[in-house]
């Protein structure tokens, strides 16, 4: 009877598998914040402040858009003011002619 020695041959990877990561993404900047400075002259319809929510409230001659953007309703001078103790507002005062 012929007896054979069988070798236990195991093959392993010669390179490690390329793993995956759940990080490595970032969102685009939204360009929020003041678009007009205090004391600046703006025309009607100009965007004054882009925001999420109401960081700053609309004052005189200022409207609020659907995305909470504040815009000038008339041509005039921009003023950032305090509204009470802990709130801020932006107003536009027409230039006297």
From Swiss-Prot:
The N-terminus is cleaved by ribosomal processing cysteine protease Prp. Keywords: Ribonucleoprotein, Ribosomal protein. GO terms for molecular function: structural constituent of ribosome. Residues 14-37 are annotated as: Disordered. PANTHER family: LARGE RIBOSOMAL SUBUNIT PROTEIN BL27M, RIBOSOMAL PROTEIN L27. The keyword Aminoacyl-tRNA synthetase does not apply. Gene3D superfamilies: 2.40.50.100. GO terms for biological process: translation. GO terms for cellular component: cytosolic large ribosomal subunit. This is Large ribosomal subunit protein bL27. InterPro entries: Ribosomal_bL27, Ribosomal_bL27_CS. Residues 1-12 form a propeptide. Belongs to the bacterial ribosomal protein bL27 family.
